[in-house]
């Protein structure tokens, strides 16, 4: 994506502007109070909500919808827990209704997850593409969660997805950017925003994603499971801002040899 800095450096997804490039989740927090504090400290403007867990009032999700000020934060319903394209499409439709119930009448966003493997939680590329094609036809703003596959990312862009969301490493693993080279290829070839999702464990990894040109990151476990979630949320926000500024500034070229920082002429003994 374009690295030219602007005075109002906003991210645009599906025609909606976001000042914050840190997206967060709502799961895994010890309690809703810590979630609220963390969202506030993160300065995030979009959070994911697992539609199935809210609908079934799963553990930790009771009262979730009432705990968030939806006039300030944009809801990103996700299809977590769906194992097939058909299931994901159905849950996406429920998510759109959930957003409307929260007062976001025109919210068509969906984070598309199709994950048949409950052990490794790796997304199904075929099911994701199938579901994405149908949801785009239905007018959804689709943000698909994918393996860091440059060919799949481009195909999803071509069918009309609003972003692509390659994983840094498996969900909740905290392994960081294990797929950095592939993510770099996705960024280089993308004409839509690239959001690195999953695997980020510490702020330096979030910063690294932005430094390499990612447009945003989505971080949940690293905040929710930290010893002090609100403090970690603030640290992530600072790291994302720093990473974005570093990308805009442009890093010095990597060299095989040393390059002196002081002049080599005009020395005392010359």
UniProtKB/Swiss-Prot annotation:
Membrane spanning stretches: none
Disordered as annotated region, ranges: 249-270
The name this protein goes by in its record: Thiazole synthase
Main location: cytoplasm
Binding site for 1-deoxy-D-xylulose 5-phosphate: 172, 198-199, 220-221
Entry's Gene Ontology molecular function annotations: thiazole synthase activity
Gene designation per UniProt: thiG
Keyword RNA-binding annotated: no
Keywords from the named record: Cytoplasm, Schiff base, Thiamine biosynthesis, Transferase
Compartment list: Cytoplasm
Subunit structure: Homotetramer. Forms heterodimers with either ThiH or ThiS.
